[in-house]
Design a protein with these regions (language model features):
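Alpha-helical transmembrane segments in inner-membrane proteins
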Residues: 1-277
């Protein structure tokens, strides 16, 4: 639920359907933050790694936004490629620090998504996602306005920078809370929002609930497949999501390049958004 909604908000704020926590350096930043917390304060509670993960993931996401706002080539594929390159740089730094401090085994569980470590006393931090999702619903109209551009937001009396940073903070907090508990799960924040947008348009008020529900069903399905394929052993959910997500991601890129800018927004609501505003 959290990853799907984070992806939907990031896509709206960045005005690009291929932006998500995995392609926007948010997840890799959270992983680096967790590693730093485990090295600096090794015997701390789950709140400390979550706090470190939030700060570093927010900085990584802001760096990503900084880069994409200053490049001239802003094609639908170029923006996520920049995010992927930035994510790989951060991941390389994470692996280097882990190797330097002999923490490779410790950080490995956070680099791969799995529900195996979800036990009592560890998963409770995910509850922080609930008020953040509620806040996302409250600010949905503001995110819609910011997604239309800085000048449009200014004309409607919305502080563009404040709403943009607030939206990125929500996405970073959600991502950090999830990565601390289950590790990295890619593609959920990328694929699920695009599917919903293709079916219902990109107005956040009408897509947040559907995105959350489809994200939950998708993750649950992948988890069941991971438990059934090689019973009695279990495949990590990140592996199953990665395989299915990679295929869907390539299909979306091809579809976008073939049909143009309206390919992923077949039912875009134009007049309704202006009326609501």
């Amino acid at each position: 639920v959290g990853m799907s909604i984070s992806g939907l908000i990031m896509q709206k704020l960045c005005s690009n359907k291929f932006v998500s926590p995995s392609t926007g350096a948010t997840i890799s930043g959270a992983q680096l933050g967790i590693l730093l917390a485990l090295i600096i304060i090794p015997s701390s509670s789950m709140l400390v790694p979550a706090l470190f993960a939030f700060v570093i993931s927010l900085l990584s996401t802001l760096a990503f936004v900084f880069f994409i706002t200053r490049i001239r080539l802003k094609g639908p594929v170029m923006v996520p490629l920049i995010g992927i390159m930035l994510s790989n740089i951060i991941l390389g730094i994470t692996n280097f620090i882990a190797y330097k401090f002999e923490a490779t085994q410790t950080i490995s569980s956070y680099l791969t998504g799995s529900f195996a470590g979800v036990v009592a006393g560890k998963y409770e931090i995910v509850y922080f996602v609930v008020p953040l999702i509620v806040l996302s619903f409250i600010l949905a109209n503001h995110f819609n306005i910011v997604g239309m551009g800085k000048d449009f937001s200014k004309n409607l009396g919305v502080n563009y920078n404040v709403i943009l940073i607030l939206g990125l903070c929500i996405c970073s907090l959600i991502t950090a809370s999830i990565v601390v508990v289950v590790g990295s799960i890619s593609y959920i924040g990328l694929i699920i929002p695009n599917i919903i947008v293709m079916l219902k348009g990109d107005k956040l008020n009408g897509t947040l609930v559907d995105t959350a529900l489809l994200g939950s069903v998708f993750v649950l399905t992948c988890d069941i497949l991971g438990r059934l394929i090689i019973m009695p052993y279990e495949l990590t959910i990140d592996l199953i999501v990665g395989i299915i997500g990679s295929i869907l991601f390539i299909a979306l890129i091809v579809y976008k390049m073939k049909y143009g800018n309206k390919a992923l927004n077949l039912k875009e609501v134009k007049n309704d958004e202006k009326d609501d505003i």
